[in-house]
Amino acid sequence: MNPEYDYLFKLLLIGDSGVGKSCLLLRFADDTYTESYISTIGVDFKIRTVELDGKVIKLQIWDTAGQERFRTITSSYYRGAHGIIVVYDVTDQESFNNVKQWLNEIDRYASENVNKLLVGNKSDLTSKKVVEYSVAKAFADEIGIPFLETSAKNATNVEQAFMTMAAEIKNRMASQPIPTKAGGPVVRPQEGKPINSKSSSCC
């Protein structure tokens, strides 16, 4: 194993354009927030290493980087993902309605046992909120995935969202036999080597 970490998990952020995926990523990875974040077209990811139950976990978190506006997210984006966070905007009913479509995309392209998390972002905009917590929670419970409301602006529950996902994946990994072949669910340490050389240029 790589001495720097015990696990390397690939996480994806998906959801409608404008729901705050990039802001969530920036808040968690860099603890920064900007009102005027403009996502680039292409692939964007950031790295953050966390500790969980005495294990060091390297999280490689991918953002769609604007591709969702053109419906061009391809199967390659989902390939190899250990966890997928589906984000909607609590002030935008349509973005919540489209969650089902995003979940269908996951079922179509991602691995069968991928972990999922539903996140309602922009919880700080209480006066503009149209998607009630109880409605989203009931939906998440119905399909059996965790749910959190977050605010990238106020940093509310952002840490908890990513740590919840990391814990869910770690628990799933712990209950599975360790794969001996390449391409198994636990990413081999050597696959993580190119990451550091790219991470500084993907803001």
From Swiss-Prot:
Belongs to the small GTPase superfamily. Rab family. GO terms for molecular function: GTP binding; GTPase activity. SMART domains: RAB, RAN, RAS, RHO. Keywords: Cell membrane, GTP-binding, Lipoprotein, Membrane, Nucleotide-binding, Prenylation, Protein transport, Transport. The keyword Ubl conjugation does not apply. The keyword Protein transport applies. This is GTP-binding protein YPTC1. It comes from Chlamydomonas reinhardtii. A lipid is attached at C202, C203 (S-geranylgeranyl cysteine). It is found in: Cell membrane. GO terms for cellular component: plasma membrane. Residues 174-203 are annotated as: Disordered. The gene is YPTC1. PANTHER family: RAS-RELATED PROTEIN RAB (PTHR47977). It is a lipid-anchor. GTP binds at residues 15-23, 33-40, 63-67, 121-124, 151-153. GO terms for biological process: protein transport. NCBIfam families: small_GTP. Protein transport. Probably involved in vesicular traffic. A motif (Effector region) lies at residues 37-45. InterPro entries: P-loop_NTPase, Rab, Small_GTP-bd, Small_GTPase.
